[in-house]
C-alpha cells in the first residue's frame, strides 16, 4: 500500500482504506495510538488532538527510529523524545494557541522497527460542552470533521470506547452507526479494561451495538511505564484477572489490534 502511495496513484482516483480513529474525549484514543506506534503523543486534560493527525507507521529495521512531521508544506524531522512537543508546536501553527480546532491535517511519518504497517487518522475527541476558550459550536465542528472522514466507504472506523461507559449511548458509536449501520467497517477498541472490569465480558459479547469487525480490549499504559512493561502487565491482566481472564484471548491486548 505504501509503495502505491509513493507512486501517487491516489491522484488517479484510487481510494485507499484508511483507519479513522474516533472516540469521546478522555476515552483513551491517544493511549491506543501510542501503543501501536510505540511513541509518546500529547496527552492531558481537555482536548489534545485539535487537528486531524495522520499517522503513517512503517516497519523498518532501523537502528534509530525516523520521525517526520509534514504540515503546511513543511517537513520537520524529530525524535521520540521530542515528538510530543513537535506535534504541539505544529498544532498551534495549524489551529492557533487557544483550544479551537482546525481541519488542516498534520502528518506524522514513523519509520521504526516492529511497528505495524498502518495509516491512521486521529481526530479530536467528541466533547459536548465547550470549555473556556473553545468556540460555542465546538461539538458541531468536531462532529462535522468526524463525519467527513468516516463517510467514505473505504474508511475503517476504529471506535475507542472506555470500559466504564454504556456503549449504546456513546456519541462516537452513534456517529459511526449513522454512516455504517450494519457496522461492517467498524472496529471497537475498549480501553481502561483494568479500571472497569465488572461486566466487560457481557458488554463485548452482547449484540446491542453493531460492531462488525469486533472488539479488542486493552489496558492503557500508565504514567511513565515503558511500552515493554505495559505489554507485560497487559498480558498478565488478561491472563490472571478473575473477570478479565474469561474474555476470549483472540480479542484482548494491543498486539491483537496491530
Language model features: what each stretch is:
Residues 1-10:
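N-terminal pre-Walker A segment at the start of P-loop NTPase domains
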Residues 9-258:
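Globular "head" domains of long coiled-coil molecular machines
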Amino acid at each position: 500500500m505504501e509503495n502505491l502511495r509513493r507512486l501517487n496513484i491516489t491522484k488517479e482516483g484510487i481510494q485507499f482504506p484508511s483507519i479513522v480513529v474516533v472516540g469521546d474525549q478522555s476515552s483513551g484514543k491517544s493511549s491506543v495510538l501510542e501503543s501501536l506506534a510505540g511513541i509518546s503523543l500529547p496527552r492531558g486534560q481537555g482536548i489534545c488532538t485539535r487537528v486531524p493527525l495522520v499517522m503513517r507507521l512503517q516497519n523498518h529495521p532501523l537502528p534509530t527510529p525516523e520521525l517526520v512531521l509534514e504540515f503546511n508544506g513543511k517537513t520537520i524531522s524529530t525524535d521520540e523524545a521530542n515528538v510530543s512537543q513537535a506535534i504541539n508546536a505544529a498544532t498551534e501553527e495549524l489551529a492557533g494557541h487557544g483550544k479551537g480546532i482546525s481541519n488542516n491535517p498534520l502528518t506524522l511519518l514513523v519509520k521504526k522497527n516492529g511497528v505495524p504497517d498502518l495509516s491512521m487518522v486521529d481526530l479530536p475527541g467528541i466533547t459536548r460542552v465547550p470549555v473556556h476558550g473553545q468556540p460555542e459550536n465546538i461539538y458541531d465542528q468536531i462532529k462535522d470533521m468526524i463525519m467527513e472522514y468516516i463517510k467514505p466507504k473505504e474508511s475503517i472506523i476504529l471506535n475507542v470506547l472506555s470500559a466504564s461507559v454504556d456503549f449504546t449511548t456513546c456519541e462516537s458509536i452513534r456517529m459511526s452507526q449513522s454512516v455504517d449501520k450494519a457496522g461492517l467497517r467498524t472496529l471497537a477498541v475498549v480501553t481502561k479494561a483494568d479500571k472497569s472490569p465488572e461486566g466487560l465480558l457481557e458488554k463485548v459479547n452482547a449484540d446491542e451495538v453493531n460492531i462488525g469487525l469486533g472488539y479488542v480490549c486493552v489496558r492503557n499504559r500508565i504514567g511513565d511505564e515503558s511500552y515493554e512493561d505495559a505489554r507485560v502487565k497487559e498480558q498478565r491482566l488478561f491472563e490472571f484477572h478473575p473477570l478479565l481472564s474469561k474474555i476470549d484471548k483472540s480479542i484482548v491486548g494491543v498486539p491483537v489490534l496491530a
